[in-house]
Amino acid sequence: MGCTVREKHVKPTRRIKAAAFRSDPPLCWVEKIAMSQSIVENLVYHPGLTDSGSVNLNSVTENPEENFWAYCTEEHLEEILLKHLEFLYNQAVSKLLELGYEERVALKAVLSNGHCYGELDVLTNIVNNSLSYLNSGGGGGGSNGNGEDRTETGFTDLRDLEEYSLAGMIYLLQQVKPNLSKGDAMWCLLMSELHVGRASTLDVPTNRSSCCTKEDSNVEDVGTGGTLDIAGFMAPALCRFHGGWGFGNGGGPEFSGNGFSMKGAELKLQREIDCPKRFNLSPSMKSLLKRNVAAFAAGYRASMKQKQIQSSDTIGDSKACNDPAIVKSCGQQPRKSGSEESVSTVLEKFRDLNLDDNLESVGVDDKDCVIVDLLHQVKDFEKKVKERKEWAQKNAMQAAQKVSEELAELKTLSSEREGIQLLKKGKQAVEESTAKRFTDKEIELRKACSQNDRANVIVRKLENQNAEIRAEREGSKLSASESLKACMEASKKEKKCLKKLVAWEKQILKLQDEITAEKEKIKALYKTLAQITEYEKEIEAKWRQEQKAKEEALAQMEEEQRSKEAAEGHNKRKLETLRLKIELDFQRHKDDHQRLEQELGRLKASSDSDSSHISNNAWKPKKSQGENIAKLLEEIDKLEGSYDNEANYDRECIICMKDEVSVVFLPCAHQVVCGSCSDSFFASNNGGSKVTCPCCRGLVQQRIRIFGATS
């Protein structure tokens, strides 16, 4: 019970809580619980639920299965079951979608063969029947486990299928139990989670028709503070929790379809001994505290087992009581003595706890504050224990009163039975109905007795819890003393820290002097760095000027190169034009020369013929003959002059157009340049290698200089 002060502030109350799952529940369970909770919230304000029209949530949680569903009409039950079936069919379609089927195919399979009958739960049966339809190719009609066949077309929508499935299950249940009405059959299906086999084994309570009697079968669930226990509204399959609760591996609560039952007589709370880090306890102190608390827990557990054995004896005695006064005395007196003994046991165990008594004196104000805080918490706990005791006593009184009423009714029924037995044998039907009513009343009496026993068990549990709370109060006092010791140790540490702080301040002053010296050095370095940067800028400016001059020189060189290339191209084009002109003139002069030679030959022939004519024709006058000869001589002179001019033109250099040609190129044998132009021409064309003839563009392999009459 080593509860610290911090835990007391965080959790000021302790309540009996239902066991939790060891792992997160599946998603389908959570959705089912949410659906049932919404249904319950709609039914809480039903007019026929109570006589006064108001609903007590504590009474609702005490018996959820019978206090809610028993008051529902047939329409409400049918609506709830149809909603449940709709949820299950939607889950089945989603599972088929997860298996890789399309939504249309999955819905068709569910509508065609998605019956909810089979050996497993409803959802698994729907999925298996739909898968069998899909595996068979989707052809033919599917049949359920009860021999009801459907065609391949199936139903038009899920609503028709849900109504058909519900009607089929009600019909089967009424075939098994013919005395069931439709409402009772739907109630059995709701309690058995739509399982026809389990529904056929359920007994319909008598308050299904009257809606006035409450059977308290889940009294242990009342400590939840007015909240609805959703697990009670679900099927029994959803009410099985796993794991243990308490000290050790066992001893945990188990849930059944009727409610909440404990394996042991009391709730064993497992709490780890937590020593807060801010207390800074020594290892020896922690180990001593843990040993003391462990010893206290073991002793308290042993004493509680003894009280449990004694309480079981008192429960057996209370079952044997028939008088209400005897039942009341049997249920209350042992509880009072048991609570006092448990409290005394807790106090004795706390007296055995020992810690170091060598604690230094601390401030009275801090101690008073802690004690006042603890006293407030103790008062709160006492108020809560008192309220729970009053509630348990009230329930015990109600149960005892109910038992007395049932006993009186049992006596009247027994007298009626004796009177009926004296009647004739022709009234056998009346006798059978009376016997049935008598057995029902006996069952109700047993239930009332068991309800009273459970109320007694709850009272003892509350008393045990009260003892635990008192033990926790003593533990809080112990933790307060521990906190005082921790404060003393903290003050010592504070003194040590102050000494360290003074040493650190001296060291800080020394470091500040060093920092100022380093700052002066950094300033000097900054000055030198500025000078270096200025020098670097000057060098960079000079380098940029040189780079600019170099770029200008390169640009000028490129410009000269381009102009030189343009001049060479122009000269080559001009040379080519001259060569073509020379060739054309040469050809023209050659043709003229041939024509003139032919004309000269013709003239010579004509002169010979003329001389013969002159001799033959002496009578012609001499004047005409002399004129003809003069014309011929003039033409010959003109031809000779033009030939001389042409020959002189062919002897000029094609480059300088002044000097006479004096160089012959081989192998083309062209003579088109003078000696000086030949040297410059060869020098400008790669130093004389691969020189082409300016006349025919042939490669010149050799040049020969010639000398004529004018050279």
Curated annotation (Swiss-Prot):
Domain of life: Eukaryota
Composition skew (Basic and acidic residues), residue ranges: 602-611
Recorded coiled-coil stretches: 390-648
InterPro entries reported for this sequence: PIR2-like, PIR2-like_helical, Znf_RING, Znf_RING/FYVE/PHD
Keyword Ribonucleoprotein found: no
Positions annotated as zinc finger (RING-type): 653-697
PROSITE patterns registered for this protein in UniProt: ZF_RING_2 (PS50089)
MF-aspect GO terms: zinc ion binding
UniProt keyword terms in alphabetical order: Coiled coil, Metal-binding, Zinc, Zinc-finger
Region (Disordered): 552-571, 602-622
The keyword Oxidoreductase is annotated on this UniProt entry: no
PANTHER family: MND1-INTERACTING PROTEIN 1 (PTHR46405:SF7), OS05G0141500 PROTEIN (PTHR46405)
Quaternary organization: Interacts (via C-terminal domain) with MND1 and HOP2. Interacts with XRI1 (via C-terminal domain).
Protein name (database record): MND1-interacting protein 1
Organism encoding this protein: Arabidopsis thaliana (Mouse-ear cress)
Encoding gene, per UniProt annotation: MIP1
